C-alpha cells in the first residue's frame, strides 16, 4: 500500500464514519411537537407507578446567583426555567443560554419532591402538588455572599410540616435540594424523595443547535450511572418505545444530556434508589429516581437530600459532585482516549491562555508521539514499492494461477523481510486517536465561543469566510503531490485527484477548531515526510528522481 492509497483508505474510513453518524442521528422517526399544557396534564397518570405527579399552577419565584438564574414554581417546587448567565445564547449576544424551559412548544424541567405513602407529592394524598410558601418572590446572591438559601414550607391537613430547601453557592452549578419532614401526628409517616427530569423529545427550531449533517452529532437524550454501570446512555426513542429503565442502586445519578450542557439528579449516596425512565405521552420523556422509603415516627423529624447539576459539562467540577458524572461529556466510544487528551489540552491552555494555540500545540505533541508509527508506515510502503517490479513480473509469469501467486508472493515478502500489512497496521493504531481528537474538539464546552485569532472568533463554529477549509484542502493537495504512488487504476486516480476537493467541501461546515487541527496535522505530515524520505534515500529505499518522473 503506497501513501496515496493510504490517503484513500483514510478518506473512505472518514466518509463512512460521517455517513454512519448521520444515519444514527436521523434514522428514528421524530414525534410531533405538542403543547406544554397537554404534557403536564398527562404526567401524573404516566408516572403513576413511581408516585410522581404532574406540575400545577403556582407562584413563580426567581433565584439568581452569579452563574445561574432559576425560576421555581411554588406548586411542587419544580425548576421550570434555568438560565446560564456565564454562557451567552449566541456569540456576541447579551441573552444568556436557556437550559431549562417551560413554553407552549417545549418543556424541559427539573422536578423534585416527596412521594411515598404519606408524601405530599403523592397524588393520592392531595388534590395536587403541595403549594409551598416562601418569604420572598426574588432571591439574589448579594456581593460578598457565598451561599443563597431558599426555604419553602408546606403543612398538610394533618399538621405535618414539610420544608423544601434550595441552596446555591457562588460560582457553582450544583444545587442542593434538601427536605425536613416533621411528623405532627400519632402514626408513622412513610416518605420517599424523588427527582425527575422531563423534556420534549422533538426540539423546536429555536433550540435545535445541532451540527450540519456532515459533522458529528453529539448525543442528546437520557443517561444514568450506578456502581455496576458507571455510564449508560438511554435514547429518547428507546423511552418512546416503552423499553424503560428500572434498576435499583445505592448511589449513582440520572441525567439528560445535550451538546455542551447537562442536567442531573444525584440522590444521596448512602440511600438505595430506583432509577426509571417513562414516556409521559405527547412526545415528552422523563428519567428520574425514587429513594427507598424513610419512616418518620410521631414527634420526630427526618432529613432527605439530593443534588441537582444544571449547567455546562465542566468535567472537573462534575466529577466533584458525583462519581462518573464527568463522563456525560459526549466523547463517544473513545472516551478513554479523549478524556486524557482533553486534560492535556486544558493543561496546555493554562500556559498559553488561547484554545486555538493550545490545539496547535497538542497537534504537534500527538503527531510527535505517533512519529515512530508514521516512520514505520512510510518505511514499509517504500519497501513495498521496491518490490513492485518483481511482483509485476511474477503476475505476468504465473497468469491466473492465484494459489501459486500467493505462495510465491509470501515467499518474496519473507525473503525481503517485508510485512505486507506494515503500511496498514500503523494506520489502524492512528485512527482511534484521530477519532478521539475529533470527539474531544466537538464535545468540550470550553471551546464554545472560544476565540482564536484574526477572523476566528468562535472555535466551535464554522469559519465564516471558509479560509481554513480551503487551506486544509491545499495542504492535503500538497501532501498528495509529494507522495510517491504506484496507483495505475484509472478510477482510483480520479478519486485521488478529487479527494482534496471533496474533503474541502466536507470541512466547510466543520467547527474551525477542528479544521485548525487538520491543517496543523497536515503541515506536520509534510515536515515528517521530508525527514522520513531523506532517511529512506540514505538507505536506498526512496528516490526523489523517481517521484519527479512519476
From Swiss-Prot:
Transmembrane feature ranges: 6-26, 346-366, 421-441, 459-479, 500-520
GO terms of molecular function: membrane insertase activity
Primary subcellular site in the record, as a coarse category: membrane
Keywords: Cell inner membrane, Cell membrane, Chaperone, Membrane, Protein transport, Transmembrane, Transmembrane helix, Transport
Domain of life, per lineage: Bacteria
GO biological process: protein insertion into membrane; protein transport
InterPro entries given in the database record: Membr_insert_YidC (IPR019998), Membr_insert_YidC_N (IPR028053), YidC/ALB3/OXA1/COX18 (IPR001708), YidC/Oxa/ALB_C (IPR028055), YidC_ALB_C (IPR047196), YidC_periplasmic_sf (IPR038221)
Region (Disordered): 28-54, 111-132
Biased amino acid composition, Low complexity: 30-52
Localization per record: Cell inner membrane
Polar residues: compositionally biased ranges: 111-127
Membrane topology: Multi-pass membrane protein
Gene Ontology cellular component terms for the protein in this record: plasma membrane
Assembly and binders: Interacts with the Sec translocase complex via SecD. Specifically interacts with transmembrane segments of nascent integral membrane proteins during membrane integration.
Entry similarity comment: Belongs to the OXA1/ALB3/YidC family. Type 1 subfamily.
Function field: Required for the insertion and/or proper folding and/or complex formation of integral membrane proteins into the membrane. Involved in integration of membrane proteins that insert both dependently and independently of the Sec translocase complex, as well as at least some lipoproteins. Aids folding of multispanning membrane proteins.
Name the UniProt record assigns to this protein: Membrane protein insertase YidC
Organism: Cronobacter sakazakii (strain ATCC BAA-894) (Enterobacter sakazakii)
